[in-house]
Amino acid sequence: TPERLVLVQGDTGPGQFLFGDGRVQAVVDFELASLGDPMRELAHIRTRDVWYPTGNLPRWFEYYSEFSGVPIDAKKLSYYSVIAMLTTALALGPVVQKLNPRDEHAEWIAQDVWSKRATAEALAEATGTPLQDTALPQAEHSYVSGLFDALEDNLREEQLPHIDESFRQHRMQMTLRLVAHMRNVAEIGAEIGALEIADMHSLLGHRPKSVKEGHRSMEALVRSADADMDDALIQYFYRHAKREVALMRGGMGRAEHARTSPIN
């Protein structure tokens, strides 16, 4: 139980604050709100900092502590960061599995894969698990690569400059990000899939027939696993997320080279 119970807004970013006359007039978007620990709110701010960077989040946490009188509890903040990162991944799961062509499709894919990586990193931080890096396949320039070169050049250099309406410019840029994802799937998707199956094989003890079948088996394993598997599973989640990010390389938008801000 927190020493000080607060209203946790739960999705705290600049878009949730309405300003007027130089002051905050209202706060909106409370569907994730709850009563809880102040450190949980800071964890949600830590998540949103990737998309709306403050420049020096640890210093802002210090300002918060000085102004509110609430000391920063790094251990609690790490714990709640897992929840905050996972909230986005869980929310976007159904969205990316059935993309709406009229929606922000590439942005949702980018946020989904980044949130998976951030969740794995938050789990590692909270449990003190050193993460091991993983090798990722690099694309060889093939015939398919040349086709994507032509498509991207046409869209970016021939079509986009002649679109005057800002909304349609935005939609074309979203399409270019989706094309980048498609290029990666075409160039390295098979290798990524093979790595994923081999990785799951080492944990499951049997080789799944497909990535989808393997993921179902991994879900069952996670549900039944004891704590002594935590380290191995966290390492797998991280490798899995890194592979997902590799398939979105060049289409990640603001999160292309983003990392979660440290706590202090």
Stretches with model-predicted labels:
Residues 70-78, 211:
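Short, surface-exposed acidic
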